[in-house]
Amino acid sequence: MVLRGVRVVELAGLAPGPFCGMVLADFGAEVVRVNRLGSTGENFLARGKRSLALDLKRSQGVTVLRRMCARADVLLEPFRCGVMEKLQLGPETLLQDNPKLIYARLSGFGQSGIFSKVAGHDINYLALSGVLSKIGRSGENPYPPLNLLADFGGGGLMCTLGIVLALFERTRSGRGQVIDSSMVEGTAYLSSFLWKTQPMGLWKQPRGQNILDGGAPFYTTYKTADGEFMAVGAIEPQFYALLLKGLGLESEELPSQMSSADWPEMKKKFADVFAKKTKAEWCQIFDGTDACVTPVLTFEEALHHQHNRERASFITDGEQLPSPRPAPLLSRTPAVPSAKRDPSVGEHTVEVLREYGFSQEEILQLHSDRIVESDKLKANL
């Protein structure tokens, strides 16, 4: 795999950091998740990782992490600005120990600025990026599209990109560097198309009344006779013509496709037509055409959809739980996600410490002093 041999130390945090670490692990990196002692939180995104339980509030725990980072390629930390410095684990310290270290800092607001030390969640980062103002139905409040955009798109995935870029640059310079990955800025960067197309008038109407935000009758969803939904994205004229054909409508009897003043009435007409058939019936009509009409699938339906099955787009883990296959698909060095169950907290404490150069005596002492936790050591005491 493409990241085979890359050592990553991931400090436990909420979803964006674990997702970043999971992507790295899926593509071959050796990821150690450092959990807090006594942590009972689920490792929802721990596939392919190993878990070390370590107390970073005590000086011995800080020393352990410094020794690990001296041998690691990447440190991934998800804390607010200043937390790592307070622990004496800031980039100045760790890069002095290991000049080749990639020090990845994933936070909501970044490492500087007036919001850098305050709490926030996906919706807050989405709001500050400007993107939230664009999402929502006409006449309604803005609403977040789950917590995908800022947490995972602008956060975890953008941080993963930063790490891979820094690793590539290190092959030239031999030096590590600090990655300041802000979810606000990552989300804003994802919205570059929106910014660049503003002068074209693509977003001149209020939220929910533009061509790509649900305002157009040919770019929205419609309810079917059985209470399900179909998604329509027939923007181009040739695709729009196929949409009308499938709906049994004549273009001569309708206003011009791009007559935005007529869109509300056209949406009502399209909705009336879609409501006359079930989702399955509409799939029979539109599947295999270029009308850009697809069913809105549930997770369960997505698992079993023929297209997704042909591409093996979903996999099962060691506990037979389904999840998406890692993407993108590389031809020579594809991801090989672990089929094992996700690790329990501290499950690999002993083996990880050994790999990072700790002697048996040191490990026993750390356990005795409650700097680390390990069920394996407990069983032997």
Swiss-Prot record:
It holds the Pfam family CoA_transf_3. One of its GO terms (cellular component) is peroxisome. The modification N6-succinyllysine is found at K86, K100, K267. Its EC number is 5.1.99.4. InterPro entries: CoA-transferase_III, CoA-Trfase_fam_III, CoA-Trfase_III_dom3_sf, CoA-Trfase_III_dom_1_sf. Substrate binds at R36, L54, D55, L56, K57, G120, H121, D122, I123, N124, Y125. GO terms for molecular function: alpha-methylacyl-CoA racemase activity. The keyword Isomerase applies. Keywords: Acetylation, Isomerase, Mitochondrion, Peroxisome. GO terms for biological process: bile acid biosynthetic process; fatty acid metabolic process; isoprenoid catabolic process. It catalyses: a (2S)-2-methylacyl-CoA = a (2R)-2-methylacyl-CoA; (25R)-3alpha,7alpha,12alpha-trihydroxy-5beta-cholestan-26-oyl-CoA = (25S)-3alpha,7alpha,12alpha-trihydroxy-5beta-cholestan-26-oyl-CoA; (2R,6)-dimethylheptanoyl-CoA = (2S,6)-dimethylheptanoyl-CoA. The modification N6-acetyllysine is found at K57, K86, K100, K117. It is found in: Peroxisome; Mitochondrion. The active site is at H121, D151. Pathway: Lipid metabolism; bile acid biosynthesis; Lipid metabolism; fatty acid metabolism. A motif (Microbody targeting signal) lies at residues 379-381. Residues 316-344 are annotated as: Disordered. It is an enzyme of class 5 (isomerase). Catalyzes the interconversion of (R)- and (S)-stereoisomers of alpha-methyl-branched-chain fatty acyl-CoA esters. Acts only on coenzyme A thioesters, not on free fatty acids, and accepts as substrates a wide range of alpha-methylacyl-CoAs, including pristanoyl-CoA, trihydroxycoprostanoyl-CoA (an intermediate in bile acid synthesis), and arylpropionic acids like the anti-inflammatory drug ibuprofen (2-(4-isobutylphenyl)propionic acid) but neither 3-methyl-branched nor linear-chain acyl-CoAs. Belongs to the CoA-transferase III family. PANTHER family: ALPHA-METHYLACYL-COA RACEMASE, SUCCINYL-COA--D-CITRAMALATE COA-TRANSFERASE. Monomer. This is Alpha-methylacyl-CoA racemase. It comes from Mus musculus. The lineage of its organism: Eukaryota, Metazoa, Chordata, Craniata, Vertebrata. The gene is Amacr.
